[in-house]
Amino acid sequence: MDVVKKSRNTHGSNDFSELIVSVRRVAKVVKGGRRFSFSVLVVIGDEKGKVGCGIGKHLEVSEAKVKAVNAARKNMIRVHLRESRTLHHDIQAKFCSSKVMLRSAKVGTGIIAGGSIRLIFEVLGVQDVVAKSIGSSNPHNVVYAVFTAFRKMLSPKQVASKRSRKIGEIIENR
C-alpha cells in the first residue's frame, strides 16, 4: 500500500517537507499467532538541497511516522544542485536489485520520474530532472538506490580538485 501525504513541519528554524513513500502492515509470528505492526518509509527535505529518508515501525501508523521522521532527520545529506534546479551531472547507482539512472535536464523539463523517485526530488527542491528506475520497484530499495547515487555525486569544486583544474574550467565545459 503506497500512500503519498505531504505536510509542512515547523519546529524552530527547521522547515522540512515530509512525504510518506509507503505504509506497510508487517507481521511478527509468535507462539500465540501473529503480531501486526506498521512500517512507514518517509522522505524529508528542505527543498533547498537537503534530503533524508527513514523507516519507522510501531503498532500505530502515526507513531511509526514520527519514528520515521526522526530517523530521516538523522540521515540528512546535502546534495549539490546546479542553479538550484537540477543535478550537476548524470549518475547511476544500484542498491540490491534496484538500479536508478538520474540525468540533469534543461530548464522547463520538469520532474520526469516515477513513483518514489519523484517524491525524493520534490522534497529535495529539484525542478528539472529525468530519472529512470530499472529492476526491482520495491520503494525501499529504489529510495536507497537514489540516496546511494546522491552520495556518489560530486560538486564542481570536488571535480576540479580531482583534476587539478579551476572550477571555471569545469563549469564552462558542460
Swiss-Prot record:
Residues 16-79 form the S5 DRBM domain. GO terms for biological process: translation. SUPFAM superfamilies: dsRNA-binding domain-like, Ribosomal protein S5 domain 2-like. Part of the 30S ribosomal subunit. Contacts proteins S4 and S8. PANTHER family: MITOCHONDRIAL RIBOSOMAL PROTEIN S5. Belongs to the universal ribosomal protein uS5 family. This is Small ribosomal subunit protein uS5. It comes from Ehrlichia ruminantium (strain Gardel).
